[in-house]
Swiss-Prot record:
Species annotation: Escherichia coli O157:H7 (strain EC4115 / EHEC)
HAMAP family recorded: ArnT_transfer
Membrane topology: Multi-pass membrane protein
Family according to the record: Belongs to the glycosyltransferase 83 family.
Keywords per UniProt: Cell inner membrane, Cell membrane, Glycosyltransferase, Lipid A biosynthesis, Lipid biosynthesis, Lipid metabolism, Lipopolysaccharide biosynthesis, Membrane, Transferase, Transmembrane, Transmembrane helix
Catalytic activity: 4-amino-4-deoxy-alpha-L-arabinopyranosyl di-trans,octa-cis-undecaprenyl phosphate + lipid IVA = lipid IIA + di-trans,octa-cis-undecaprenyl phosphate
Gene expressing this chain: arnT
Pathway: Lipopolysaccharide metabolism; 4-amino-4-deoxy-beta-L-arabinose-lipid A biosynthesis
Designated name of the protein: Undecaprenyl phosphate-alpha-4-amino-4-deoxy-L-arabinose arabinosyl transferase
GO biological process, one term: lipopolysaccharide biosynthetic process
PANTHER family: MANNOSYLTRANSFERASE YKCB-RELATED, UNDECAPRENYL PHOSPHATE-ALPHA-4-AMINO-4-DEOXY-L-ARABINOSE ARABINOSYL TRANSFERASE
Amino acid sequence: MKSVRYLIGLFAFIACYYLLPISTRLLWQPDETRYAEISREMLASGDWIVPHLLGLRYFEKPIAGYWINSIGQWLFGANNFGVRAGVIFATLLTAALVTWFTLRLWRDKRLALLATVIYLSLFIVYAIGTYAVLDPFIAFWLVAGMCSFWLAMQAQTWKGKSAGFLLLGITCGMGVMTKGFLALAVPVLSVLPWVATQKRWKDLFIYGWLAVISCVLTVLPWGLTIAQREPDFWHYFFWVEHIQRFALDDAQHRAPFWYYVPVIIAGSLPWLGLLPGALYTGWKNRKHSATVYLLSWTIMPLLFFSVAKGKLPTYILSCFAPLAMLMAHYALLAAKNNPLALRINGWINIAFGVTGIIATFVVSPWGPMNTPVWQTFESYKVFCAWSIFSLWAFFGWYTLTNVEKTWSFAALCPLGLALLVGFSIPDRVMEGKHPQFFVEMTQESLQPSRYILTDSVGVAAGLAWSLQRDDIIMYRQTGELKYGLNYPDAKGRFVSGDEFANWLNQHRQEGIITLVLSVDRDEDINSLAIPPADAIDRQERLVLIQYRPK
């Protein structure tokens, strides 16, 4: 009966965090609008081989993540939940692997359930796992690889070992098809410390080639097909998206070596109090095969991405699955022997909630700031933000009331965040980061436009997805579409600032021409170097400028 209650509680937890509130949040640009539009175009065109954005070739990532996103929109429609359905599914599948692997290692159902809840409630997992990017997919394939390698090495027969390594190769191949060759580097680096300490080189050399073969066979059909259709895909993807992004001096998203330290700290909420103990206990018990394996899958990817020049918080998402398992194991030990870490965790959550309440007041219309984050007419959003942090502090306090029994309620600290964050986003943020908000305000003007031009790829993708059209023209800036715009068949999809006046004269009689520009909050739109317009509609950071036929 207790198991049934636990399962009902888990399903209610998943519904409140990962299902019910998702549609209340508008899509963020540039990431969510980009991936939403790529998948919409895939469904509309029926081309499941070559990814396109705004009708242009888009070679930043391989195809598998777009397949899953497209299936999400196909099943649930072109709406906010449909766009995020794929990443939510991947996150829940990863959580299922956490459950299974924990059960496999320790044969403890309570520990397995706790590891799952910890994983799903970690701030970084929840933030990325409900956000339409490709990282939850690659995290799933990496965690699946972690489980597959363990299965292979624990098998007692050659058939079991062969099956495990073949499965490992498939997960690596799908990882390559999701985000590239990092899906090969991370597993290799993660298993080497364990193989070395356990002296299992023989099995690795005997059966490892099976993983290589199955990986190649997984990638080969699509890899050959896209090479035939787009011969320069693999050159661009390998050189620009791997070497330049991660290793060269001009790498994207450059950050210092210690960049991931605050990411790990913030990402571990509401279980931050368990982090030092989980890592220390894992190191202290490193002679235990399972513990050192999980520790290696936590630390090695973190070190790898710390050394790389380009860094983003999403890159280390896969580290948190083994970390959640270590945290759960340590938490049960602490509850049984010395609950000090659990008390510290409760106080950390109280401090975080109280700090958030104070910070919300400071940036509210009633605070000391001259330019508050929220305006007076947005008072309900301020109260939503207060509720988020109040609930966080409340559950932090509740875990301290009887710490040996109530400490696990820390999983409910982010409940307010899950339910209310979509209602607390300030208008000034929505106007710049949520193109859907802009489209809703300007729908009547945008809909009849013959041509729409914009200077932001993220805004362009948002407009294209909301209006169900892929012919948005880039104005002044090419951004990440630069490569796709270089193709001969992309002629006419970019208009420079100097060319705009002539372009306008040539196309004005064809219908309404709409220009959507991103501007600074205090920028005078009358100073823009554009021809006089027939209509201007400013929505704070985004401006709609229209030219009608004469």
